[in-house]
């Protein structure tokens, strides 16, 4: 769910709180990583790729559920995710690291679109 007020003591908001804190503290790093994604994927493609990742993580990592939500084939979703993972963590990084870094890029992208501060 969405959290209006971010508080680490609220179990419903803990992850969102930590993501925002990390994004705020490491804004230069996240911005650099986001720009590198932008160099690899065109504007519209970057939008599609990040929407794919967001749907995948919102579906709890279920390829089937995310593919259904996006109205794409499961193989398409897996292909996009592999391309994103390789762009964010080329040759290294476990699933947690890939998810964390991609979620930071998704958050950064959404903040750019909304033109609002990270916190």
What are these regions (language model features)?
Residues 1-119:
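Cytosolic nucleotide-utilizing catalytic cores of signal-transduction proteins
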């Amino acid at each position: 769910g969405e959290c209006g007020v971010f508080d680490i003591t609220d179990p419903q908001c803990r992850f969102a709180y930590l993501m925002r804190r990390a994004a705020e503290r490491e804004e230069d790093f996240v911005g650099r990583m986001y720009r590198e994604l932008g160099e690899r994927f065109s504007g519209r493609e970057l939008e599609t790729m990040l929407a794919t990742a967001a749907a995948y993580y919102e579906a709890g990592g279920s390829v089937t559920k995310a593919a259904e939500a996006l109205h794409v084939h499961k193989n398409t979703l897996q292909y996009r995710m592999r391309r994103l993972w390789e762009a964010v963590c080329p040759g290294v990084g476990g699933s947690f690291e890939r998810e964390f870094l991609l979620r930071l890029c998704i958050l950064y992208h959404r903040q750019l679109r909304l033109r609002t501060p990270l916190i």
